[in-house]
Amino acid sequence: MYREFEEFVFNNYDFNEPAIKRKYYHSKRVSTISKKIAENLAWPLEDIKLATQIGLLHDIGRFDEWTMYKCFNKYMDHGSYGAYLLNKEEYEKMFNIKSYDKQEVLDAVYYHNKLKLPASLKDNKFCKLIRDADKLDIIYQLSQREIVMENNTHVISKEVFKEFNKGTTITNKHVKTYADKVLSILALVYDINYDYTLELLKNFNYINKIYDNLENKEFYKDYFDKI
């Protein structure tokens, strides 16, 4: 599984590019997190293996996205594109995706980055798990650096304020300021599905680390306390 993924990345993309390297390591971490959560939930061994594979492949669309556009989240929906790639026979063979697992893989990859799951998949355990694992690693990455926004103001947009107080994740297009970005990070916690993911988040202390890196901490204290 990992060997095929490494060959795919190293043979098709420039690993010297920091963005490619970052997505490669993110994919491996999410795979490890996915396995850890599935094991904690006492899933059958085959389901643990599938969750691990989905974690590894969830961002496969990111590599082409960066190579083509040199940016993320502007011109391509990488979840939808990743599912499109994995639906191809050559990718199915490359990553040894079992025919009876294929729809689970496609659904999990397609919907991992959407604002919410459709009603038909709201109880799908693989879709729920990959969204948890991905968010946990995104929060980890954000805890390791300062938040940077072109609009560096401590002003919360009306739409972001409304979504945050409803207890929902924040729509990306609504994020316009530094303050919006901070709340959008915190709101990721609202969409975590499994108690064990929340336990990991607490044990790793990521939210407090993000708070420690903030500008104008007092402005955000009540929002962090709410989480």
What are these regions (language model features)?
Residues 29-37, 76-91:
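An active-site-proximal "capping" alpha-helix that borders the catalytic cofactor pocket
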Residues 42-53, 92-111, 122-129:
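Acidic/histidine metal-binding catalytic segments
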Residues 14-18:
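Glycine- and acidic
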Residues 20-28, 32-44, 57, 68, ...:
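Divalent metal-dependent phosphate-bond-processing catalytic cores, especially two-metal-ion Mg2+/Mn2+ enzymes
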Residues 1-13, 54-60:
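Short alpha-helical hairpin
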Residues 48-74, 78-82, 86, 103-115:
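His-Asp-centered metal-binding catalytic motifs of divalent-metal-dependent phosphohydrolases/nucleases
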